[in-house]
Amino acid sequence: MKASGVGLVFVLAAAWSQTLAGEEDTSATAHLVSQIDVRDFGAETARIGDLNADGGPDLLFVQSVFGTRAITCLTATSIFGEILWQTGSPSLDNGRIYSDLPVQIYDWDKDGKNDVLYVRQATYVDPAYDGKSPRERAPKYEGEARMIVLDGQTGKEKGGFALPAPADDCFLFADLTGCGRREDLVVKDRYWNIWGVAHAGEVLWHWEGSVGHFPACADVDDDGKDEVFVGFALIDHDGKVVFDHDAKGAHQDAAYITRAPDNTWRLLFGNGGIHCLTPKGEELWSHPLGEAQHVLAGRFRADSPLQFPVVDRTPVPHGRDDNAWGILYLYDLDGKEIWQRQQDKGAWAIAIVPVNWTGGGAPMGILVYGHLQGRPAVIYDGNGEIAATLPMAYTPSRDEKDRKADYYGLVADVWGDSRDEVILFGSRGACIYANPRLLETETHYNETLYPGM
């Protein structure tokens, strides 16, 4: 993404202040470029995208009722925390989550500007909400769920359509109709049902089974339409089942589709292990693990084109307490373990995101957050070494309890320098880190009045 004018001003001002001080710490592994006062709209769910149509990225903070997952407030801000718009009522009590939330940023109507889409729940007739326990589905609903489309610049409602009542867990965009753009939807309930929905709101198909957390989609049969992978099953664009393995009461915690260097597809998912499948459902390799909660694919090392980072949150049975810990693994294309890194005690809920921290065509890094107790996020390189440490930066008004609240992470190139920045966000704070190391590009150090290199 191209940096906005305000972003450039901020960077130049920061660089100028460092020059005036005469001390720029070139050994630093990360530079704090934005510290956001989230006041009462902080959230453990956030999205990033250009909302005000100025060419630069913005943030969307999403609050919900913890137990019901009903979305209560959406707050759009600049990357420096300036509020662009807000819909709903913010509350310090509604920033926490236990699951994904059905909200995304996308140019839904193809007018060249982003919209915000979210699902408004149908009425759960029973069970009655007790005010604290998670409520994942109901035996009976009143009405239907509804996809709401908001104008990204103003937050005003501009459209919407009905969805099946239980379809309020999360959704993703896919090309199910062969239009050449991912403008159809895959929607689901928490664990049991999934629907394909056309852009106009028509339900194309419904599949009942172990759908897991968040599906993955790709055109693995090269017919111009996406297939939907839910871990134990692969569903074609028209709802026909390509394969469906017996989940035996389990569900996928993470799903990923990638193309190997030989142009064949790999379908990976995690649950009580990490599994690598072909598009026909044949298992190429697997490793039993306690709880493979996160699975990625990418080039994280220079010695081979594709590796798979995996998080095991439960390598030994535990009560999810301060004595529990997780393990980060890195596997090669054939499933051979390259390395593993056991986390500190208490860091069992870690999550991972691929991050282009170095840029310049270098291998990706692995952002690891969720160490709990206010501990910093870190970036691992492909050798299993920590390349950067990123503590959550809170505004001075936050007390010690706030500073130990959970927070999450996402990445995006907010400066337009070909490298990712890291955005950390939670119910009590948000901040953005950049890589301060010099990125050398030929056009930066060989400038000329007569371009033509």
Task: Label the predicted regions.
Residues 5-15:
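Bacterial N-terminal signal peptides
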Residues 18-453:
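Beta-propeller-forming repeat regions
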